Amino acid sequence: MRVVVVGGGTAGWMVTYYLSQIHLCVNVSTKEIPIIGVGEGTTGKFLDVFKMDPVDMMHGMDALPKLGIKFDNWSKTKKSFLSPIDGTPTASYYIDYTCLAHRPVGKHITLMDDEKSNYFIDHPNLICDYNQNGMHIDAYKTSEFFKQKSSVLKHYDAKVVKVNREYGRITSIELDTGDVLKGDLFVDCSGFSRVLNDPDDWVDYSEYLPVNRAVVYRTETENPRRPYTLATARKYGWTWEIPTRTKIGKGYVYCDKYASEDDILEELGDVEKVKSVEFKSGRIAKFLDKNCLSLGLSSGFLEPLQATSIHLTLMQLERFAYGYPTEDLFSDEDMERDYNQYCATLHDSMRDFVSLHYSGGKTDTDFWKDVKVTTFVQKIISLTKKRLPRSFDFPKIGGGVAQESYNPILWGLGHFDGCPVKQTFDTDNASMVYWRQRAKEFGGNTSNYLTIDQLNDIIASLGQT
């Protein structure tokens, strides 16, 4: 199959690398169009899909391990809480009872609490104890990393000026260099410009995910690097801190209905603005339209919280690669409908999960007073007043957000406080002591693990920066 990928950002070169392993692939992108990424996070899916040496990836992407997220000031009941990457990888009843008795449980939680990486001290090689982790990456270096690794036939440094179609299928694209490229599959990774697909094909999420702007900034002082993204609720949205090997990316995500950029910079104080980013939360309706596949920001965007963009791209890409081994299947309308439904449900499931984070009951500004949560989130929160959510309460879709990811957020925002089982625990001291001890045992001891800064120093000392 001959594949033409349009786009040169993180998604564009990540997709080009993946598809070039199994198909004849060319890439069309230009440095004149800047990369949107400002420092990003991934989920465990990233390492799972690419199966590369994590140390090699940390070198090439300026990356460090990400074990989860620390949330500060997201509710009126709790100041801060930790949420492990991809939920809590343990049996369901552990999740339930340790949440009720103490906090979410797992090695990730303990490592984050002690601000350690998942790499051992005093080992001749950098050995990872627990490989279910994401990464904090530099978007620019990640794009270049995959570009260098790709088995691409040719890279066209050009812009698309015309898309030629016949009976709804793309037959060729014309470039500003005069080149005309034909292909069996055309992949749109052109970001918000969506040069290959219909810009009117849009499902809006802004009713529940109202943030639509971000200011990226620097500060004079840097905190120690930690194994998590720091997400802090603010007056008009929230700020992030993402530690990579050579810098700590920072930004303020907000809604321009409630604040101007000047308001944001005033609240932040003594910072240096790097760039501004505009975005819309939502998705397209047709992710696959005959022989045109949309991935990355071209297919949709929720908001920066929970590192959804790269995760969704990989879920869509992997499903497509397994489902469409040959180009003759592009004419199968049932397969196309099933793929589009899968991608739509995947995005909607992630929208619900991100919406959950805004349910902590904050009312200190108009932004927090006005923000709404989705119908599904309302249902789950209502359920916690009667019983604990179970796995069957969540959508059955590969890659969708499961109970394991919801529980730490529900606990951290205080939604378990009104659960009858929690109230029983609060009066049953023996059960409380038992499950707190089990949580401590399950988390283990972290004294033989490197801090993130120690890990970073070791990577630098290897001389491959």
Where do the model's predicted regions map?
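N-terminal Rossmann-like FAD-binding beta1-loop-alpha1 element of flavoenzymes
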Residues: 2-24
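Short amphipathic alpha-helical face segments that pack within enzyme cores
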Residues: 14, 18, 45, 141, ...
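Glycine-rich FAD pyrophosphate-binding loop
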Residues: 20-38
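A short, flexible beta-alpha/helix-coil linker loop
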Residues: 29-32, 222, 247-248, 299-302
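Dinucleotide-binding Rossmann-like beta1-alpha1 core, especially the glycine-rich loop
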Residues: 41-119
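Long, low-complexity C-terminal extensions of enzymes
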Residues: 65, 322-465
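Predominantly flavin-linked oxidoreductase catalytic cores and closely associated redox partners
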Residues: 131-264, 317
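FAD/FMN-dependent oxidoreductases across multiple families
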Residues: 245-247, 254-358
